[in-house]
Amino acid sequence: MKVLLKIIVGRAMNILKNFSVPNLCDAGAKPLNGIKPILENQKLVFGEAITVKISYNDWGTLIKTISFAKNKFIVAEVVGEGKYETAVWGGLASLNAKIKGVRGVVIDGCVRDVEDIKALKFPVFAKNFCPNAGKPLNLGEINVAVNCCGVIVEPGDIIVGDCNGVVVIKKESLPEIIENAKNIKEKERKIRERILRGQDLRDVLNLE
């Protein structure tokens, strides 16, 4: 059964590139509300989650995680009252992650070195940014369930991000969400055609 699920999920992952994050959100994927891309024109990226739980001043654990996050999407829960006053990710981490083949990073907290991240065009999604840095404490937990923006993310969950934000999909739900997204996209295509023919969106949607 696990082998069959792996095959099904693998095929579904190849189809993800055909949808936007809003498509997938409408189809049932869970949004990480408040998480935004550092790159304003961020293209669609996706991958399996490798999760990290750290204190607001510990960037060491994230640096450690990069070493075994190839083809993964790092998702970090940042805990503590200082999570919006201290950055746990920056330009050097982004450079290292890009070279190591990390798909992207989600930080439920702050990042810095925004200009460096943009120059690298490395997919970083975060709540905010600030100049203050934490410390290389390396006291966090890796590959545990984390609470990111109120959503429980587990290792292996599918993370999808673009210029609109980030959503999370459980592997077992991926085929259903893909099918829902196909139907949604087809409905939108038909609506778009009617608008181009001169109809008002209000009338197309039967709004009084």
UniProtKB/Swiss-Prot annotation:
GO terms for molecular function: 4-hydroxy-4-methyl-2-oxoglutarate aldolase activity; oxaloacetate decarboxylase activity. It comes from the Archaea. SUPFAM superfamilies: RraA-like. Pfam families: RraA-like. Gene3D superfamilies: Ribonuclease E inhibitor RraA/RraA-like (3.50.30.40). This is Uncharacterized protein MJ0644. It comes from Methanocaldococcus jannaschii (strain ATCC 43067 / DSM 2661 / JAL-1 / JCM 10045 / NBRC 100440) (Methanococcus jannaschii).
